[in-house]
């Protein structure tokens, strides 16, 4: 077995929830402020998932006070406490960049049955 592949297997998280573009997720992130650590929740729509192995990342978008906020998270990061799937979305694209130009009801995504 390849040495790099075996090292990646050791570092990878085992309890990852299955989700994809269009899904609404709630990401619990550990944030260090001064000397204390707390959990910050970031909820939004997954607009892309890229890479593979340890370098896999996903981008979550939400609108906060009328301003679009996008955050990219490494999937296997130790800073991510857990990922919850709130809703499964029905989309036909792997990259949902078109949501950046939509506002209000136009930016809604259908639920998967």
Swiss-Prot record:
Q: Name one GO biological process term.
A: translation
Spell out where the chain crosses the membrane. none
Indicate whether Heme appears among the record's keywords: no
* Gene Ontology terms, MF aspect: structural constituent of ribosome
Q: Does Protein transport appear among the keywords?
A: no
- Functional summary from the UniProt entry: This protein is located at the 30S-50S ribosomal subunit interface and may play a role in the structure and function of the aminoacyl-tRNA binding site.
Quote the HAMAP family the UniProt record gives. Answer: Ribosomal_bL19
Q: What's the protein here called?
A: Large ribosomal subunit protein bL19
Taxonomic lineage is:
Bacteria, Bacillati, Bacillota, Clostridia, Eubacteriales
């Amino acid at each position: 077995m390849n040495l790099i592949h075996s090292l990646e297997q050791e570092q990878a998280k085992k309890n990852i929830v299955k989700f994809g573009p269009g899904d609404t997720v709630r990401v619990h992130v550990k944030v260090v402020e001064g000397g204390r650590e707390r959990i910050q929740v970031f909820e939004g729509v997954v607009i892309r998932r890229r890479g593979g192995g340890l370098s896999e990342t996903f981008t979550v978008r939400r609108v906060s006070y009328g301003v679009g906020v996008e955050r990219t998270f490494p999937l296997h990061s130790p800073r991510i406490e857990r990922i919850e799937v709130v809703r499964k979305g029905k989309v036909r694209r792997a990259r949902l960049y078109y949501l950046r130009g939509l506002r209000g009801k136009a930016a809604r995504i259908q639920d998967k049955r």
